[in-house]
Amino acid sequence: EEAIDAQALVDQNCTGCHGSEVYTRDERRVESLDALHGQVRMCEQNLELTWFDDQVDAVTTLLNREYYNFEP
């Protein structure tokens, strides 16, 4: 099984619409791990990326580890 490069997915898709400031701003919308997963899924669907669930999960995990630090 091939590993998912979540950073590449973020670099190729997410930061094309916004920079990392949305993850670090004081008034960020995401306040839980479930909400983060939902936001990643919403962006994926809005951009019609057709990611698999494991890709959404990998990006959620990366963003949580790098920016949010929500408890699993």
Curated annotation (Swiss-Prot):
Positions contributing to heme binding: 14, 17-18
Keyword Iron: yes
Highest taxon of the lineage: Bacteria
Keyword list, A-Z: Heme, Iron, Metal-binding
GO molecular function, one term: metal ion binding
Name recorded for this polypeptide: Green heme protein
Organism taxonomic ancestry: Bacteria, Pseudomonadati, Pseudomonadota, Gammaproteobacteria, Chromatiales
